[in-house]
């Protein structure tokens, strides 16, 4: 699954882009406005075709207002709750993680690497940093659950809070990347303490 794309790359092209835009904004734009909001990623013709197809599927409603036609999500459509969940792959990843970790032993789970920076592809691995107690040893199990739930291989780095702080002080590149680009999925990013002296 491509965690960087709406719907994880399952619904692609103009149809996926239009559907993601309408689900995320809750707005009621015209077809031309949808096209402009997509920043030219798709032609006006392909946006109009996508809107037509989504209206035919019943997921999107069209309403005539004066000389214009506006589009909105049909909130009564049976697929909309699932589509809302799918439009946010990082949210789905968070759900997978929360279902398989003991939050009493884990302070934070942080997404980092290409998936966090927006440079991932469908076959990119998912890099996670787990900061927790020294007796937490579920990295292999967590990686398996993430792979099963998302379809991507998963690499898990594990730190205690003290180990993470020490790695920050040493200036370890991977920890710098985590602090710079990391997306907290559980808990929060550790705050870097200013050096004294």
Regions found by a protein language model. Give the residues of each.
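Catalytic core of pol beta-like nucleotidyltransferases
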Residues: 1-107, 117-123, 132-197
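Conserved, compact domain cores that house catalytic/ligand-binding motifs in diverse enzymes
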Residues: 127-128
């Amino acid at each position: 699954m491509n965690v960087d794309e709406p719907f994880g790359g399952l619904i692609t092209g103009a149809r996926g882009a239009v559907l993601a835009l309408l689900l995320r904004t809750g707005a009621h734009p015209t077809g031309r406005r949808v096209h402009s909001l997509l920043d030219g990623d798709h032609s006006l013709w392909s946006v109009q075709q996508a809107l037509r197809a989504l209206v035919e599927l019943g997921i999107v409603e069209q309403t005539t207002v004066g000389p214009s036609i506006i589009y909105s999500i049909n909130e009564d459509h049976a697929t909309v709750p699932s589509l809302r969940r799918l439009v946010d792959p990082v949210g789905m990843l968070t759900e997978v993680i929360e279902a398989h970790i003991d939050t009493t032993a884990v302070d934070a789970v942080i997404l980092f690497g290409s998936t966090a920076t927006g440079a991932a592809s469908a076959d990119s691995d998912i890099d996670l940093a787990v900061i927790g107690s020294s007796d937490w040893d579920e990295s292999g199990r967590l990686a398996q659950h993430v792979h099963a739930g998302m379809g991507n291989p998963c690499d898990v780095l594990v730190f205690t809070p003290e180990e993470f702080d020490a790695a920050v002080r040493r200036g370890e590149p991977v920890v710098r990347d985590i602090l710079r680009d990391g997306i907290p999925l559980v808990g929060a990013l550790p705050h870097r303490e200013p050096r004294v002296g």
